[in-house]
Amino acid sequence: YKTQVEKILTANGRATGVRLYNDEIHNANWIISAADGHGTIFDMLDGEYTNRKIRKMYDGSLPTHQMCQVSMGVNRDMSAEPHWLTVLLDEPILLAGEERHELGIKHYCFDTSLAPPGKSVIELIVRTNYAYWQRIYGRRTYDTEQSQVSDIIIEHLDKVHPGIEADIEFVDEATPMSYEHYTGNWMGATSGWLLTGKTMPMMIMGVPKQLPGLSNFYMAGHWVEPGGTVTLAAASGKNTIQLICSSDGKYFETSLP
C-alpha cells in the first residue's frame, strides 16, 4: 500500500505477483493493474505481452486528454453559478503555441471542505499539447509559459465573471508534465484517450482488459475505458472483478455497506 510497483512478475505466461521499488515481492493469484496503461504494458511488463493493435494504440498517434489546468482560490461565493461551464470564445486565444477556442470553468462549492464560507475554489481547463511542454520542461521558459497561460486564462475568466480577478487569493498551474510527474499517466493524459472520430470505435467496441499471452492478469482504469472520467474508471474495476468471478465459476454479488 502506498508503494510503487516496479515490475509485474510472470512465469509461463501467467502473472504471479509484483516487485516493488524497495525490492519487496508480493505473490498473488490475480494481478489487476489500475496504473497507467503505457507504463503497465511497456515498463512493468517490458512490452512482452503485446500485439500489433496494442502497439498501435500506444504509438502516440491517437489523441489523449492533455490539459492545462489553472486552479485558484477566490474571495467570492460561486455556489449560485453553474458547476461546470464551457465558454466558447469570440476570438481564439494562443496558449502554448496553439489556438484554443473554448475554456472550461468549474467550481467546487458543492464541497464545503475546500474553502471557507463566502470563498470558492475554481478550476479552469484548456486543451494543450504534451510535446510542447515536454520540449521546454526544466528550462526557465517552462515557468514563464505557465505564468503566461495563467494570466491569459484569468483575463478571460474576468470577462465571464466581471471583477473576479481582484478576488483571486491563490493560483496554481498544472501542465501535462505536472500530471505525468504526479500521477504517472503517459503523456500527462488526465483521462486516457480523448474521444474523437479516431477513438470512438474503441469506446463502442471496448478495449480488452487482458493482454495476449498473459493469464491471471487484468487492467482497469481509464486506459481501458475510452472517455475516461472517475465513474468509468471505477466501474471498470467492478467489471474486472465480475470477469474474474466468471472465470472462477463464482457468482458475482454486490451488497450495500
How would you name each of these model-derived features?
Residues 163-226:
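A glycine-rich dinucleotide-binding beta-alpha-beta segment and adjacent secondary-structure elements
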Residues 4-117:
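Mid-domain catalytic core of redox enzymes
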Residues 32, 72, 124, 157, ...:
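Hydrophobic, well-ordered secondary-structure elements that form the walls
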Residues 21, 38, 244, 248-250:
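Catalytic phosphate/nucleotide-handling subdomain of diverse soluble enzymes
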Residues 75-180:
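C-terminal segments that line or cap access tunnels to active or ligand-binding sites in enzymes
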